[in-house]
Regions:
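Hinge/lid segment of periplasmic solute-binding proteins
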Residues: 127-143
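Bacterial N-terminal signal peptides that target proteins for export
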Residues: 9-19
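Short, Lys/Arg-enriched N-terminal segments with co-localized hydrophobic residues
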Residues: 1-8, 29
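N-terminal secretory/targeting leader peptides
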Residues: 18, 22, 33-122, 139-142, ...
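Sec/Tat signal peptide C-region and signal peptidase I cleavage site
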Residues: 26-32
Length: 344
Protein backbone atom coordinates (compact mmCIF):
# COMPACT_ATOMS: atom_id res chain seq x y z
CA UNK A 1 0.00 0.00 0.00
CA UNK A 2 1.11 3.56 -0.68
CA UNK A 3 1.45 6.12 2.05
CA UNK A 4 -0.40 9.41 1.93
CA UNK A 5 2.86 11.14 1.00
CA UNK A 6 3.45 8.75 -1.89
CA UNK A 7 -0.10 9.33 -3.17
CA UNK A 8 0.46 13.06 -3.12
CA UNK A 9 3.75 12.69 -5.01
CA UNK A 10 2.14 10.39 -7.59
CA UNK A 11 -0.58 12.93 -8.22
CA UNK A 12 2.00 15.68 -8.63
CA UNK A 13 4.02 13.61 -11.12
CA UNK A 14 0.83 12.70 -13.01
CA UNK A 15 -0.28 16.33 -13.26
CA UNK A 16 3.18 17.42 -14.39
CA UNK A 17 3.19 14.68 -17.04
CA UNK A 18 -0.25 15.71 -18.29
CA UNK A 19 0.84 19.33 -18.36
CA UNK A 20 3.98 18.53 -20.32
CA UNK A 21 1.99 16.43 -22.80
CA UNK A 22 -0.51 19.25 -23.28
CA UNK A 23 2.27 21.78 -23.72
CA UNK A 24 3.92 19.50 -26.26
CA UNK A 25 0.68 19.23 -28.24
CA UNK A 26 0.21 22.99 -28.17
CA UNK A 27 3.79 23.56 -29.32
CA UNK A 28 3.36 21.00 -32.11
CA UNK A 29 0.15 22.67 -33.30
CA UNK A 30 1.81 26.07 -33.10
CA UNK A 31 4.83 24.90 -35.08
CA UNK A 32 2.71 23.34 -37.85
CA UNK A 33 2.58 25.73 -40.80
CA UNK A 34 -0.27 25.96 -43.31
CA UNK A 35 0.29 27.36 -46.77
CA UNK A 36 -2.81 28.86 -48.35
CA UNK A 37 -2.88 28.01 -52.06
CA UNK A 38 -4.99 30.48 -54.05
CA UNK A 39 -6.67 28.94 -57.11
CA UNK A 40 -8.77 31.31 -59.23
CA UNK A 41 -10.23 28.45 -61.30
CA UNK A 42 -13.69 27.10 -60.41
CA UNK A 43 -13.68 23.99 -58.26
CA UNK A 44 -15.43 22.14 -61.10
CA UNK A 45 -12.57 22.64 -63.57
CA UNK A 46 -10.45 19.55 -64.31
CA UNK A 47 -7.33 21.54 -63.46
CA UNK A 48 -8.67 22.12 -59.95
CA UNK A 49 -8.92 18.37 -59.42
CA UNK A 50 -5.31 18.06 -60.54
CA UNK A 51 -4.30 20.77 -58.08
CA UNK A 52 -6.13 18.92 -55.31
CA UNK A 53 -4.05 15.84 -56.09
CA UNK A 54 -0.89 17.97 -56.04
CA UNK A 55 -1.83 19.28 -52.59
CA UNK A 56 -2.60 15.76 -51.35
CA UNK A 57 0.79 14.48 -52.53
CA UNK A 58 2.68 17.35 -50.90
CA UNK A 59 0.84 16.93 -47.61
CA UNK A 60 1.41 13.18 -47.58
CA UNK A 61 5.12 13.69 -48.14
CA UNK A 62 5.42 16.27 -45.36
CA UNK A 63 3.40 14.39 -42.75
CA UNK A 64 1.74 17.43 -41.20
CA UNK A 65 4.63 19.68 -40.18
CA UNK A 66 3.83 21.91 -43.14
CA UNK A 67 0.64 21.55 -45.15
CA UNK A 68 -1.00 23.11 -48.19
CA UNK A 69 -4.68 24.04 -48.33
CA UNK A 70 -6.29 24.79 -51.68
CA UNK A 71 -8.82 27.62 -51.97
CA UNK A 72 -10.57 27.35 -55.35
CA UNK A 73 -12.88 29.63 -57.29
CA UNK A 74 -11.27 32.81 -56.01
CA UNK A 75 -12.73 32.11 -52.55
CA UNK A 76 -10.00 34.17 -50.87
CA UNK A 77 -11.22 37.27 -52.70
CA UNK A 78 -7.92 37.91 -54.46
CA UNK A 79 -8.37 39.12 -58.08
CA UNK A 80 -6.28 37.01 -60.44
CA UNK A 81 -5.19 40.17 -62.27
CA UNK A 82 -3.54 41.37 -59.04
CA UNK A 83 -1.36 38.30 -58.45
CA UNK A 84 1.91 40.14 -59.03
CA UNK A 85 0.85 42.62 -56.38
CA UNK A 86 -0.39 40.38 -53.58
CA UNK A 87 1.83 37.30 -53.93
CA UNK A 88 5.27 38.91 -53.42
CA UNK A 89 3.86 40.70 -50.36
CA UNK A 90 2.78 37.42 -48.76
CA UNK A 91 -1.01 37.84 -48.89
CA UNK A 92 -1.01 34.09 -49.53
CA UNK A 93 1.81 31.59 -49.49
CA UNK A 94 1.14 30.11 -52.93
CA UNK A 95 -1.00 31.02 -55.93
CA UNK A 96 -1.94 29.76 -59.36
CA UNK A 97 -1.04 32.28 -62.06
CA UNK A 98 -1.85 32.67 -65.73
CA UNK A 99 0.34 35.00 -67.76
CA UNK A 100 -2.47 36.22 -70.01
CA UNK A 101 -4.29 37.68 -66.99
CA UNK A 102 -1.27 39.69 -65.85
CA UNK A 103 -0.74 42.03 -68.79
CA UNK A 104 -1.70 45.17 -66.86
CA UNK A 105 1.28 44.87 -64.54
CA UNK A 106 3.59 42.81 -66.75
CA UNK A 107 2.76 43.51 -70.42
CA UNK A 108 5.57 41.25 -71.60
CA UNK A 109 3.88 38.22 -70.01
CA UNK A 110 0.63 38.58 -71.92
CA UNK A 111 2.43 38.57 -75.27
CA UNK A 112 4.55 35.44 -74.76
CA UNK A 113 1.81 33.20 -76.18
CA UNK A 114 -1.12 34.93 -77.85
CA UNK A 115 -4.00 32.50 -78.10
CA UNK A 116 -4.97 31.51 -81.61
CA UNK A 117 -1.48 31.89 -83.07
CA UNK A 118 -0.56 28.25 -82.39
CA UNK A 119 -3.11 25.84 -83.78
CA UNK A 120 -1.67 22.34 -83.52
CA UNK A 121 -0.39 20.09 -80.76
CA UNK A 122 2.77 19.21 -82.69
CA UNK A 123 3.68 22.86 -83.08
CA UNK A 124 2.77 23.72 -79.50
CA UNK A 125 4.94 20.98 -78.02
CA UNK A 126 7.96 22.57 -79.71
CA UNK A 127 7.31 25.83 -77.89
CA UNK A 128 6.49 24.61 -74.37
CA UNK A 129 10.07 24.39 -72.98
CA UNK A 130 10.85 27.90 -74.21
CA UNK A 131 7.60 29.28 -72.83
CA UNK A 132 8.32 27.76 -69.41
CA UNK A 133 11.82 29.26 -69.41
CA UNK A 134 10.45 32.70 -70.27
CA UNK A 135 7.80 32.53 -67.55
CA UNK A 136 10.39 31.57 -64.95
CA UNK A 137 12.63 34.48 -65.96
CA UNK A 138 9.84 37.06 -66.07
CA UNK A 139 8.16 36.03 -62.82
CA UNK A 140 11.56 36.20 -61.11
CA UNK A 141 11.66 39.87 -62.08
CA UNK A 142 8.52 40.26 -59.95
CA UNK A 143 10.04 38.41 -56.99
CA UNK A 144 7.96 35.31 -57.65
CA UNK A 145 9.45 31.82 -57.83
CA UNK A 146 7.85 29.49 -60.39
CA UNK A 147 7.63 26.20 -58.48
CA UNK A 148 5.27 24.22 -60.72
CA UNK A 149 3.26 24.20 -63.94
CA UNK A 150 -0.14 22.93 -65.04
CA UNK A 151 -0.56 22.27 -68.75
CA UNK A 152 -3.73 23.57 -70.39
CA UNK A 153 -5.43 21.30 -72.95
CA UNK A 154 -5.42 22.19 -76.63
CA UNK A 155 -8.80 23.88 -76.63
CA UNK A 156 -11.42 24.47 -79.28
CA UNK A 157 -12.90 27.94 -78.92
CA UNK A 158 -16.54 28.40 -79.89
CA UNK A 159 -19.01 31.25 -80.12
CA UNK A 160 -22.02 30.79 -77.80
CA UNK A 161 -25.03 33.01 -78.54
CA UNK A 162 -28.24 33.83 -76.70
CA UNK A 163 -30.96 34.23 -79.30
CA UNK A 164 -29.84 33.14 -82.77
CA UNK A 165 -27.07 31.10 -84.38
CA UNK A 166 -23.92 32.87 -85.55
CA UNK A 167 -21.62 30.96 -87.90
CA UNK A 168 -19.82 33.68 -89.84
CA UNK A 169 -17.64 36.68 -89.05
CA UNK A 170 -20.12 38.75 -91.06
CA UNK A 171 -22.98 37.73 -88.73
CA UNK A 172 -20.76 38.29 -85.69
CA UNK A 173 -20.34 41.93 -86.73
CA UNK A 174 -23.97 42.51 -85.76
CA UNK A 175 -23.45 41.17 -82.21
CA UNK A 176 -21.77 42.23 -78.98
CA UNK A 177 -19.16 39.60 -78.14
CA UNK A 178 -17.66 38.66 -74.78
CA UNK A 179 -13.95 37.77 -74.82
CA UNK A 180 -11.35 37.32 -72.05
CA UNK A 181 -8.11 38.86 -73.35
CA UNK A 182 -6.95 42.08 -74.91
CA UNK A 183 -5.45 40.35 -77.95
CA UNK A 184 -8.94 39.00 -78.70
CA UNK A 185 -10.45 42.47 -78.38
CA UNK A 186 -7.89 43.86 -80.82
CA UNK A 187 -8.22 40.97 -83.28
CA UNK A 188 -12.01 41.07 -83.41
CA UNK A 189 -12.07 44.87 -83.55
CA UNK A 190 -9.82 44.75 -86.62
CA UNK A 191 -12.44 42.45 -88.19
CA UNK A 192 -15.28 44.85 -87.37
CA UNK A 193 -16.65 42.90 -84.39
CA UNK A 194 -17.56 44.70 -81.15
CA UNK A 195 -15.73 42.70 -78.47
CA UNK A 196 -15.28 43.44 -74.80
CA UNK A 197 -13.51 41.73 -71.92
CA UNK A 198 -15.89 40.36 -69.31
CA UNK A 199 -14.42 38.29 -66.46
CA UNK A 200 -15.43 34.64 -66.33
CA UNK A 201 -17.31 35.11 -63.06
CA UNK A 202 -19.44 37.89 -64.62
CA UNK A 203 -20.12 36.20 -67.95
CA UNK A 204 -23.27 34.34 -66.90
CA UNK A 205 -25.06 37.52 -65.83
CA UNK A 206 -23.78 39.43 -68.86
CA UNK A 207 -25.26 36.82 -71.18
CA UNK A 208 -28.47 36.45 -69.23
CA UNK A 209 -29.18 40.19 -69.15
CA UNK A 210 -28.10 40.92 -72.72
CA UNK A 211 -25.01 42.98 -71.92
CA UNK A 212 -23.51 40.83 -74.66
CA UNK A 213 -25.20 38.70 -77.30
CA UNK A 214 -22.49 36.08 -77.63
CA UNK A 215 -19.54 34.76 -75.66
CA UNK A 216 -16.26 33.28 -76.79
CA UNK A 217 -15.57 30.18 -74.70
CA UNK A 218 -14.27 26.59 -74.96
CA UNK A 219 -17.04 23.98 -75.01
CA UNK A 220 -14.90 21.78 -72.76
CA UNK A 221 -15.38 24.19 -69.86
CA UNK A 222 -18.81 25.63 -70.67
CA UNK A 223 -20.60 23.51 -68.07
CA UNK A 224 -18.34 24.83 -65.28
CA UNK A 225 -19.86 28.29 -65.72
CA UNK A 226 -23.38 27.08 -66.66
CA UNK A 227 -23.09 28.68 -70.09
CA UNK A 228 -25.69 26.25 -71.44
CA UNK A 229 -28.29 27.99 -69.24
CA UNK A 230 -27.88 31.36 -70.97
CA UNK A 231 -27.05 30.24 -74.52
CA UNK A 232 -29.12 28.56 -77.19
CA UNK A 233 -26.61 28.21 -80.02
CA UNK A 234 -22.91 27.49 -80.47
CA UNK A 235 -20.40 27.02 -83.30
CA UNK A 236 -16.68 26.27 -83.33
CA UNK A 237 -14.39 29.10 -84.46
CA UNK A 238 -10.70 28.27 -83.87
CA UNK A 239 -8.26 25.94 -82.05
CA UNK A 240 -6.22 27.44 -79.24
CA UNK A 241 -3.00 26.55 -77.46
CA UNK A 242 -2.19 28.38 -74.25
CA UNK A 243 0.86 28.83 -72.10
CA UNK A 244 0.61 26.72 -68.93
CA UNK A 245 -0.67 27.87 -65.58
CA UNK A 246 2.17 28.57 -63.17
CA UNK A 247 2.28 27.81 -59.44
CA UNK A 248 4.00 30.74 -57.79
CA UNK A 249 5.51 31.43 -54.39
CA UNK A 250 7.09 34.64 -53.15
CA UNK A 251 10.78 34.44 -54.03
CA UNK A 252 11.70 35.52 -50.51
CA UNK A 253 9.51 32.82 -48.94
CA UNK A 254 10.81 30.16 -51.30
CA UNK A 255 14.41 31.05 -50.50
CA UNK A 256 13.72 30.65 -46.78
CA UNK A 257 11.69 27.45 -47.17
CA UNK A 258 13.14 24.27 -45.69
CA UNK A 259 14.76 21.96 -48.25
CA UNK A 260 12.42 19.12 -47.24
CA UNK A 261 9.37 21.23 -48.05
CA UNK A 262 10.92 22.40 -51.31
CA UNK A 263 11.65 18.83 -52.33
CA UNK A 264 8.08 17.67 -51.57
CA UNK A 265 6.59 20.54 -53.57
CA UNK A 266 9.00 20.08 -56.48
CA UNK A 267 8.39 16.33 -56.71
CA UNK A 268 4.59 16.72 -56.61
CA UNK A 269 4.86 19.56 -59.15
CA UNK A 270 6.78 17.34 -61.55
CA UNK A 271 4.09 14.65 -61.20
CA UNK A 272 1.45 17.32 -61.84
CA UNK A 273 3.18 18.42 -65.03
CA UNK A 274 3.56 14.87 -66.32
CA UNK A 275 -0.15 14.19 -65.69
CA UNK A 276 -1.40 17.35 -67.39
CA UNK A 277 1.10 17.64 -70.25
CA UNK A 278 -0.89 15.13 -72.31
CA UNK A 279 -2.91 16.18 -75.35
CA UNK A 280 -3.88 13.02 -77.21
CA UNK A 281 -7.41 12.86 -75.78
CA UNK A 282 -8.19 16.58 -76.00
CA UNK A 283 -10.23 16.43 -79.21
CA UNK A 284 -12.36 13.51 -78.03
CA UNK A 285 -13.04 15.33 -74.77
CA UNK A 286 -14.10 18.34 -76.83
CA UNK A 287 -16.56 16.24 -78.85
CA UNK A 288 -17.92 14.64 -75.68
CA UNK A 289 -18.42 18.10 -74.16
CA UNK A 290 -20.35 19.26 -77.22
CA UNK A 291 -22.60 16.19 -77.05
CA UNK A 292 -23.30 16.90 -73.39
CA UNK A 293 -24.18 20.52 -74.15
CA UNK A 294 -26.56 19.37 -76.90
CA UNK A 295 -28.26 17.07 -74.39
CA UNK A 296 -28.69 20.12 -72.16
CA UNK A 297 -30.39 22.14 -74.90
CA UNK A 298 -27.65 23.82 -76.92
CA UNK A 299 -28.12 23.73 -80.70
CA UNK A 300 -24.64 22.97 -82.03
CA UNK A 301 -24.30 24.48 -85.47
CA UNK A 302 -21.85 24.14 -88.33
CA UNK A 303 -18.31 25.34 -87.76
CA UNK A 304 -17.22 28.76 -88.92
CA UNK A 305 -15.72 28.37 -92.40
CA UNK A 306 -12.01 27.77 -92.99
CA UNK A 307 -11.89 31.21 -94.60
CA UNK A 308 -13.32 32.89 -91.49
CA UNK A 309 -11.02 30.89 -89.25
CA UNK A 310 -7.97 31.91 -91.28
CA UNK A 311 -9.17 35.50 -91.23
CA UNK A 312 -9.23 35.47 -87.43
CA UNK A 313 -5.89 33.65 -87.08
CA UNK A 314 -4.20 36.11 -89.46
CA UNK A 315 -5.61 39.01 -87.50
CA UNK A 316 -4.51 37.71 -84.11
CA UNK A 317 -1.04 36.87 -85.48
CA UNK A 318 -0.61 40.49 -86.57
CA UNK A 319 -1.87 41.64 -83.18
CA UNK A 320 0.76 39.47 -81.48
CA UNK A 321 3.55 41.46 -83.14
CA UNK A 322 1.86 44.77 -82.34
CA UNK A 323 1.28 43.92 -78.68
CA UNK A 324 4.88 42.79 -78.24
CA UNK A 325 6.18 46.04 -79.69
CA UNK A 326 3.76 48.06 -77.59
CA UNK A 327 4.73 46.22 -74.41
CA UNK A 328 8.40 46.92 -75.06
CA UNK A 329 11.04 45.72 -72.66
CA UNK A 330 11.61 42.00 -73.06
CA UNK A 331 8.36 41.37 -74.95
CA UNK A 332 9.73 41.51 -78.53
CA UNK A 333 12.63 39.24 -77.58
CA UNK A 334 10.25 36.79 -75.87
CA UNK A 335 8.12 36.63 -79.00
CA UNK A 336 11.18 35.99 -81.17
CA UNK A 337 12.29 33.17 -78.87
CA UNK A 338 8.86 31.51 -79.15
CA UNK A 339 8.81 31.95 -82.94
CA UNK A 340 12.28 30.42 -83.15
CA UNK A 341 11.13 27.45 -81.08
CA UNK A 342 8.18 27.05 -83.44
CA UNK A 343 10.53 27.11 -86.43
CA UNK A 344 8.89 30.14 -87.97
Amino acid sequence: MCSAGENIMNKIFKNVAIGLTGASLIMTAASAEEWRFNNFLPETRPESAQLEQFVTEVNAALGGETSLKLYSGGSLGLPNTDTLRFLPKGAVEMSLMWANYLGRDAPALSSVVVQGTIGSIAEFEKAIPTVRDIYEEEFAEWDVASVGYVAIPMLSVSVFCREEPVRTIADLKTKKLRVWARDQVEAFTSLGVAAQIIPQEEMYVAMKTGVVDCALYPALYAHTVSLQEVSKYASFLYPMASGPYVIGVSADRWEKTDDTVKAAISEAAEDLWVRTNQYEADYQRELDARDKLVEQGIVWGEDFSDEDRQMFVSSVTEIWAELAEEAGGNAPAYRERVLEALGR
